[in-house]
């Protein structure tokens, strides 16, 4: 539920005011904090995401297409029978190879374990993260529960969700690789340097010279690494996508507790599978992209921090204004630095390869909160 959705459900003002300010304002109003400028600015978003339009986001998962069609039909029938509810848009997630992102890289490999969930950390995760970082009402990494909406029946066991939709400019990405790589091997190596992993998901740290599909597919190994032996980023560049969004034990100029910025995420890809034959002219179709969805008890703070400091700036690893080569906003040609001896290699011409098409801050209520909300009607 968005803040406007809670208002439409009749939540009293006294309770609405207990929600955090960024959530109350909505994602579009936080464009400056999110660095959603230029092509990513709210005025360029799809209508469904324009301010005030989206009240509720319903996600339906199923084991196969037939089960999904059945679930969607049921949902549409129930919506049609519900007074005061209008379906303003829908999007079918799930590319043919949904485990990979639009650029052909295996995605959603690194996820934090949650303390008390019964799921042990995989090799490479030092320890489980306090449950209060993800679910409201429990101990967080600072030793105390984070603030939550009141009353407790509304806030406790709920969480916040960030939803962001991107169109992926796969053709421009391919053209960039071809402009800076003479051979197919050169292009694959550059792409891996930009992501921090090979397409299979194998981390550069463990397989620096070539892809290793067996390693990439093994959850007991594909996340079992750190950066202590690569402080200068000569194997995994300091500014690559993976190292920015999960610095692990990297030495950071901007001091922060990495664990308070961990998220449980799901990137849902849509559109045709990746092909190296996709050209820049094909990007105009807008048929490839992903929904970036994550939950966190401080989701609004985390995404704004990530967008400001880790994605659209490089000061925290002494890279100045250099930005994330995959999801950063490059209003002019950007730069990507690959540290190497004797001199680092700088590659110009990085573009905005993922263009923002809309998003919203959402509150995911608990079962007790759903009951409380129903009682307000």
Residues covered by each model-derived region:
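Long, low-complexity, Ser/Thr/Gly/Pro-rich intrinsically disordered segments that act as flexible linkers
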Residues: 1-377
